[in-house]
Amino acid sequence: MVKFRPLFPIHLNQIICIGFLWMLLTCFTGNAYAIDQTFSYLSVFSGSQDLSASPGGLGSESNYFEWLEESHGNLEENRKVQPSVIGFDFYRASGVVASGFGLEIQRYKKSFNFSDGSGLTLEALGVLYGFNFYYRGDFWFPFFGFGTGNYSSKIQETLYSGSSVTETTVFRQVDTTVYYKLGARIPFNSWGLVLTQQFTSANMEVASANKNVALGGVSSLFGLYYGF
């Protein structure tokens, strides 16, 4: 078995970025509460994320699955995963327009199989953060957001070649993640529904194959939020 890097490594620059964002959020909310125009949301999402879809012009360099199909036959599953997502949003309203910051943590895991019996398991943890802009309508709050972040991923391969089998575990972190999203919140007093479509570029090099796999793609998510 070949191993690369620790499981879900935490880099110093990641800690600094998240800490700096949290400091900004704390200062931002502290100042705005004095004029009663600061809002915070805690959201829980689920839905579908298509790893094979082009992330809306952000760029994707995925050739890992195609390379495996050349040697191990057709992929038996599609490349859609079902992420679990938790989001935190802090923003300040000025009339019907609002802007602020957001932090999102998502995780997914899926096994893929090929026609010759080979297979792999892909697991990823994403931490995304950026800016959000809202229009506060009477019945819904459409929004647009963009930002950056990182993904940590683990891939476990079991690949057959004739009578031999190769098992490999690869760990990797992608620090060049970028995203943007469109969506809407439908409020019902302090809680409500949220729908969003997100486009994410996060290309990871698989060291065992010298190929790239997309960890982002296009997500269509639905969830609930609580405002406070």
What are these model-derived regions, one by one?
Residues 32-106, 110, 225:
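Short glycine/proline- and aromatic-enriched beta-strand/turn motifs that initiate or cap beta-hairpins
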Residues 40-46, 101-105, 142-146, 182, ...:
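Membrane-embedded beta-strand positions of outer-membrane beta-barrel proteins
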Residues 70-77, 113-122, 162-171, 205-213:
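Extracellular loop and loop/strand-boundary signature of outer-membrane beta-barrel proteins
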Residues 1-39:
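Cleavable N-terminal export/targeting peptides
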Residues 51-55, 110-112, 153-157, 202-205:
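Short acidic/His/Gly/Ser-rich catalytic and metal-binding motifs that mark active-site loops
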Residues 82-163, 176, 215, 221, ...:
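Gram-negative (and chloroplast) outer-membrane scaffold detector with strong preference
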Residues 55-59, 65, 74, 170, ...:
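Predominantly the C-terminal beta-signal and adjacent terminal strand-loop region
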Residues 49, 158, 167-169:
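Serine/threonine-rich low-complexity intrinsically disordered regions
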